[in-house]
Structures are given as C-alpha cells and as structure tokens.
Swiss-Prot record:
GO terms for molecular function: 4 iron, 4 sulfur cluster binding; electron transfer activity; iron ion binding; molybdenum ion binding; molybdopterin cofactor binding; nitrate reductase (cytochrome) activity. Its EC number is 1.9.6.1. Component of the periplasmic nitrate reductase NapAB complex composed of NapA and NapB. This is Periplasmic nitrate reductase. It holds the Pfam family Molybdop_Fe4S4.
Length: 847
C-alpha cells in the first residue's frame, strides 16, 4: 500500500490519537482519517458483542479483516463504537485459534481420558453419529441434548431447532440466553401475551427521565448510555435515577442514585404502586380500559434440586410431592380487582420499604414522584439485575405494573425496556424459539395448535414434535451429572465458565464417563478443554449471518473472509451432521407410516432439502448481494449448492407473518441497516400496541395489548420474598457477579485482543475499604473467596469503578483463571428457570 504526502500526514495524526487513547491500530486502518484505507473493501455488519446491535463497517484486505469502524449510517450507534467495538478486527486472530476437529484419544481410539488429537471432519461426524444413535436407541430423545446461544445467527438457531425438535424429536435444546433473558421472556408473556419490548431506542430522544434497575449501562451498553447522556445534558429537566446493589459507573450521571439490599427491589416496586394509588396518581381511565388484575402464586421455591429442603417445604414449585403429583404451579394466578391489588400493596409503605431496602426514604419518594408526574415521560431500563434473579419473572411483571398504572407505555419516550446482553438473544433465542419450551414466533411446544403449525410448515407428519417441554440449561447440567443425558452438544457458549455452581453441578456431568460432550468453538475455552470432541467453528464475518437486537431490529451481514484451516460454521455443521441419519434411525415406525415417502431419506433431505429451504438457486447469492460485493458467494451456499441462508430465513419467516411477528423479505435486509418488526408492507414498527404506530392496532382502538385475547395487559400482585441464600456468621458477605466494559462475558474473544487484555488483565474482587480493613486486607493483596460450593483467589480492589457497600463484594466472570462461578448457587427463578448470579453468600480472607 502506497501513501501520498497528504495521506501520510493523516495516517500519523490518526496513529497519534490512537496512541494517546492507549490503542494500537492495524496499519491499513491508519491509511487515512475520514476516508477508507487504500485497497480495503468496506461492508456493513452488526457488532459481534452485546445486544445493542451497533453497526460497524468491516475493512477487508487480502482475505483478512484489517479494520473496523463505526457505521455513520447506522441509526443505532450513529458512527460510534465502544472500546470493544473498536477492536472487532482482532477477535478472529488469536494465536490459539482452533483449525481442526480435536478428539480425546488414547492408542489411536476415542478415550474419555485421552489427549486431544487432530482428526478429520468425517471422523468427527462418524463418532458423533455413532454416539447419538446409541443414545437414541437406548434412551430415546430424552437421552440427547443441545446447549446453544444468543450468539447464534438466526439461521443457525433455526437449523438447530429443526434438527433437534423435528429431526431427533427432542425438545432438549436450550440457549445460554436462559442465563440472561428467560425472565424477560416469561415476564413479557405473562403480562402482555407476546414477547419483546414495545418501544425502541428512539424512546431515548423523547424521554424526560430514565430509571435504571439493575443495569450498569455505562459499561454494558455504552453506546445507548452515550445517547442517554446526551439527552440528560441537553434536555431541560431531564433526570437519571439508578438503582443497584452497589455503586458503579452509571452512578456518575445519576441525579438519584440508590443502593438497595439484594432482593428488596421487589419491595421497592410494590412501594411505587402503593404510592401511585395512595396519592391518586393512577391513570384510572387507562387502567379500566386496558388492564386486568391477578394474584400470583407465592410459595414457589428457588429452582434448586427437589431434595433441597427449600424445595421440599415449598407448596407451589411444581415439583412432585409425597403423593407423586406436582405441588402446585409457580406460574399460576387468579383474577383480582383493583381494590384487592391496592390492599395487597398497601403494606409497602415508605417507612417499611426504606427500612427493608436500606434506601433513604427521600430517595424513594423522589423516584415515586417522578413516575407519578403525568407530565414526565419515563423509560425504565433493566438488564441482568432484574433477570438473573430468583424472582426474575416477578420483577419484570412488577415494573410493568408501574408503567401500566400510570399509562406510561407504548408511546414515544414512555415505556419499560428490557435490554439484552447478547447480539441475538432476541433474534435467535427468543424469536426463533431455541428455548426448550418454544417454537418460532412465540409459539410453544406444549400447545397442540402451535405444534400443528410447525409440523405443517416443516412438512412433518402429525405427532413429530413432542409436547413434553425439554430440559432447560440448569436441568441439562443436572441430567448430565445424574447420567440421564448421554450426548451433549454445545455451541457458541462457554458454560463451564459462565454457568452456576461449576464444581457441584457442571464439571461432574461433563466428565461423567457415560456422557459424550461436543463443543463447537473457535478457541480452546474452559468448556472446550472439558469436552470430548472440539469442532473448530467459523466466527462472525467468516460466514453470512443475521442477528436481532433489543429493539426488535433484524440485521444481516455478508461473509467477508474465509475461516482459517478447516473451521466451519455452525450452520454447516448442523446440515452436514443431519446427513448421517436416515429417518428410520430416529423416527418410530408408526410416525414414518404417516409419511412413507420419507423412507430411505436422511434428516438433511427431510429438513433442509425439502423443496422450501433449497428453493433458491446458487445464482441468487450473487444477485441479492451484487449492490455491495460483485461476484459475492458464501461458503455454506457454495458447499450445499443453493442459497442456504435465504431458504432457511424465508421458511422461518412464515411463522410470524400475519401474526404480529412479521419479518421483511430476505433481500431487503441485505440493503437496510436493520428493520424493526413487525414489518408490514415494507414499513417497520417503532412502538407496538398503540394506534398510529402499530399496524396490528386498528383505527379507533387506541391501545390494544393484542398478545392477550381480550386485548388487555395483566397487573400482578406479588410479594417481597428473601433470596435462596443470605449471609450468615459463616459466610458473611453477599457476592454479586457481572461484567466489565473491556471484556465481554467469559472473555474468550476479548482476552485475545492484546489491547483489551492489557487494559484489564485479570478479574479482581471489589470490596468496601472498611470491610477490607476489618479482615486485615489491603488493596492489591491476594485473597481467598469461598462459598459453600467452592473457592477462588483474586486480588483485592478497594477503589476504582465499582464501589460495593459494606457487606457486599463484586467480582466479574470474564477471567478463566479465576472462575467465580465455582462460588455461585444454582438457584433459578421457578417460572423462567433463569439463574440468580447476583446474590449468594461468601467469606473473604487472606490467601
């Protein structure tokens, strides 16, 4: 690459700016400031990291990503990136990138305790098929399972769901989004009868105030935080309220920062409702027209194993009782009146709530006045503080209570907004339905009508999809440990580091001699190194993909470069693996008798070469994408001989079109910077459920929550309850886990970026200085953190970005050398089955 004098000066200016910021940029990225580098091709793609859905421009030179930059045409991020986004060009080029399948072998044959040995894809699929067939023959569909991801592309998740739920006839498929978004899903479904936020990011520029509940947006959603910051600093009267169990960077902008005792957010939400009612600030007209009241089941347990005393004493956890029958239903609810709801929340007075939560009364009252003010437009944001909660579904329902009582919902600048942590937790896990109980477009396996729709669209005989809900994430780990699962395939996730209670419930199952565990991953993660077979996987722009972000925006990208060595995409893996099974090997004879024409065919033939998925010819790949890359082709389509991604997407889209989950035509997404569904007549929807914005709300209806048959939303009466585990004299501190700005989740990508690793090389334990002093600890000292389940060692930090109150410590989970999830409890919300990573009891002492 040659530069003229002017370009050389620009390059040096950019390099100097980067050095000042502590960044090093690829040479090609420094070629010019304000214009693309020479000989570099640029194309759009959504960011690989969080659920915000920023768009970036990807610079490619000689089949290598050499630079990325914020996409100035992107409505989400408007040309900005966070620190992780600036280094996207480096995530695929770690020195230890896997390029060949690796099987544990001893003396030339598979051995559970053998050493990882490179093998061919044929050998990998041969042993996988052998193990899966043995498991299916001996234990049926219940003996196999898959753990997927909110980082799957839309068509990867859809193909995996077809393979398991239709092909293997097993609903034992669950995503790692179970650990982060399941409570939001169940909360939406219980209140509105339909999933995902009713608003969009445009709410930020319309709102007067923002309330953060268990969300450190400054670090976890920094681009959205920049938009909130701009609104706060430029809009007169704008306010930011932040609630958390510890102080973090979002508090720097807060007008009203509140630190509460873990789990008492339940009481605070009820106090807000009580305040609205007692002070006559309920929007009675809205409530009477659009709301029903219900009382939820309460003694629901904590999602622990059935033999745990906390579950044995619970009366409505759904577990088998002494008579073998389920003990109630944790999701049950009975109708109530407004007056009954008012009486229920009346005990949550200001004084009681302040004492219980530890939040000063004047701070609670200020927030209550904000919600009560009819002239204030408010957006409530939350993430894992709400969702990773033993009552996660409840707190989601309860924030909706507040917005429904005030009518501050489904209009510009007003609404409850659940943020996502993964790039396609919405688009893949939720919309495609890769949860153990779901099908696409909010359909569920337990509903016969929904199964019928899926079977017809997939051209399956009636009865193919089982009605039995499969194993959720935590249940999968327990089933592996108990020997009930024999074959397990995980992809695009790192549960051996990210899952709860690793020592007791995850590692023993993976190393169970009866289990065969496969991990698809680009890097040798903790999970990969604990498996029996590792499949090297293509990353991000090494394949054509699609993600769906937190505001219902579906975004596509084109393959930009080839994956290294023998790495293959997850999509390629699922379709190729399907070729190893004849229908007769996986379906019972009585089912096959209903479709005798399928005899002799493979699962690939029936699921993916079915005349629908394979109807778009290979030539379409170039035609659809000619506007961006002349002569474009992607590896999967080239291999299978048709436009695989388009065929899968268009079949999938049939589930939602006409059912308020409408997706646009495939080709349109490759031109757009994403579209927010429902997309009807080519027009996206910004605000749902309100006339004038939502095509599914008819003229004259005003507001209609059409997910429920009567068009009304539900307000739930739900109490404060303590968590499953609280500090005591032996384990005297609360532990909260989470992330940091510089790393994403378990760090399998970001820790391989030198600049990000140098910025935060290891996880530290954040502690209040007085708690440290009381224990004879000093900043920088190595300490031991122990719970009833395990122990880890980390350096102590008493300053910095996170400032816990006395009695609580905080530790991020990105560091594979300090596995904080050895400490956490595998308690879950009994409704959503999502893990509570935010509270357990630990003790800290000198190492």
């Amino acid at each position: 690459m040659s530069l003229n004098r002017r370009e050389f000066i620009k390059t040096n200016a950019v390099a100097a700016a980067a050095a000042t910021a502590g960044m090093s940029l690829p040479a090609a990225a420094l070629a010019q400031a304000g214009s693309p580098p020479l000989q570099v091709r640029w194309d759009k793609a959504p960011c690989r990291f969080c659920g915000t859905g920023c768009s970036v421009l990807v610079g490619v030179q000689n089949d290598r990503v050499v630079a990325t930059q914020g996409d100035p045409e992107a409505p989400v991020n408007r040309g900005l990136n966070c620190i992780k986004g600036y280094f996207l060009s480096k995530i695929m080029y770690g020195a230890d990138r896997l390029t060949r399948p690796m099987l544990r072998k001893k003396n030339g044959a598979y051995d559970k305790n053998g050493e990882f040995t490179p093998i061919s894809w044929d050998e990998a699929f041969d042993i996988m098929a052998q193990k899966w067939k043995q498991a299916l023959a001996a234990g049926g569909p219940d003996a196999i399972a898959m753990f997927g991801s909110g980082q799957w592309t839309i068509w990867e998740g859809y193909a995996a769901s077809k393979l398991y739920k239709a092909g293997f006839r097993s609903n034992n498929l669950d995503p790692n989004a179970r650990h982060c978004m399941a409570s939001a899903v169940v909360g939406f479904m219980r209140t509105f009868g339909i999933d995902e936020p009713m608003g969009c990011y445009d709410d930020i520029e319309h709102a007067d105030a923002f309330v953060l509940w268990g969300s450190n947006m400054a670090e976890m959603h920094p681009i959205l935080w920049s938009r909130i910051t701009d609104r706060r600093l430029t809009h007169a009267g704008s306010e930011v309220h932040v609630l958390s169990t510890f102080e973090h960077r979002s508090f720097e902008l807060a007008d009203n920062g509140m630190i509460f005792v873990p789990q008492t957010d339940l009481a605070i939400l009820n106090y807000l409702c009580n305040y609205l009612i007692q002070n006559g600030r309920v929007n009675r007209e809205f409530v009477e027209q659009h709301v029903n009241f219900k009382v939820g089941a309460t003694d629901i347990g904590y999602g622990l194993r059935p033999n745990d005393p906390r579950e044995q004493s619970a009366t409505s956890n759904g577990y088998p009782g002494a008579d073998g029958k389920p003990k109630g239903d944790p999701g049950a609810a009975t109708p109530a009146t407004f007056e009954e709801f008012a009486a229920f929340v009346s005990t949550y007075t200001l004084d009681y709530t302040a004492r219980l939560s530890g939040v000063p009364a004047e701070k609670l009252q200020r927030m209550a006045e904000l919600y009560a003010d009819p002239d204030k437009k408010i957006v409530s944001f939350w993430t894992m503080g709400f969702n990773q909660h033993a009552r996660g579904t409840w707190v989601n329902n309860m924030i909706y209570n507040v917005h429904l009582l005030t009518g501050k919902i489904s209009q510009p600048g007003c609404g409850p907004f659940s943020l996502t942590g993964q790039p396609s937790a919405c688009g893949t896990a939720r919309e495609v339905g890769t949860f153990a109980h779901r099908l696409p477009a909010d359909m569920v396996v337990g509903n016969p009508a929904h199964r019928k729709i899926a079977e017809e669209l997939w051209q399956l005989p009636e009865g193919t999809i089982p009605a039995k809900v499969g194993l959720h994430a935590v249940a999968q780990s327990r089933a592996l440990k108990d020997g009930k699962l024999k074959c397990y395939w995980t992809s695009t996730t790192n549960n051996m580091q990210a899952g709860p209670n690793i020592n007791d419930e995850i590692y023993p199952g993976w190393r169970n001699p009866e289990a065969f565990v496969v991990v698809s991953d680009p890097y040798p993660t903790v999970s990969a190194l604990s498996a029996d077979l590792i499949l090297p996987t293509a990353m991000w722009v090494e394949k054509e993909g699609a993600y769906g972000n937190a505001e219902r925006r579906t975004q596509f990208w084109r393959q930009q470069v080839r994956a290294p060595g023998e790495s293959r995409s997850d999509l390629w893996q699922y379709l190729e693996f399907a070729k190893r099974f004849k229908i007769e090997e996986v379906w019972p004879a009585e089912l096959l008798d209903k479709k005798p024409e399928y005899r002799g065919k493979t699962l690939y033939d029936v699921l993916y070469a079915n005349g629908v998925v394979n109807r778009y010819p290979l030539a379409d790949v170039g035609v659809v994408n000619k506007h961006a890359i002349d002569g474009y082709m992607n590896d999967e389509s080239q291999h299978f001989g048709f436009y695989v991604q388009k065929g899968l997407f268009e079949e999938y889209a049939q589930f939602g079109r006409g059912h308020a989950h409408d997706l646009a035509d495939f080709d349109l997404y490759h031109r757009a910077r994403g579209l927010r569904w429902p997309v009807v007549d080519g027009k996206e929807t910004l605000w749902r459920f309100r006339e004038g914005y939502d095509p599914y709300v008819k003229q004259g209806e005003g507001v209609r929550f059409y997910g429920n048959k009567d068009g009304k939303a539900n307000i739930f009466a739900l109490p404060y309850q303590p968590p499953a585990e609280v500090p005591d004299q032996d384990y005297d501190l609360w532990l909260c886990t989470g992330r940091v700005l510089e790393h994403w989740h378990t760090g399998s990508m970001t820790r391989r970026v030198p600049e990000l690793h140098r910025a935060v090389p290891e996880a530290v334990l954040f502690m209040h200085p007085d708690d440290a002093k009381e224990r004879g600890l000093q900043r920088g000292m190595q300490c031991k953190i122990a719970s009833r389940r395990g122990e880890v060692f980390a350096s102590l930090e008493t300053r910095g970005r996170n400032k816990p109150p006395r009695g609580l410590v905080y530790m991020p989970f990105f560091d594979e050398g300090r596995l904080v999830n050895k400490l956490t409890l595998d308690a879950t919300c009994p409704l959503s089955k999502e893990t509570d990573f935010k509270k357990c009891a630990v003790k800290v002492q000198k190492a």
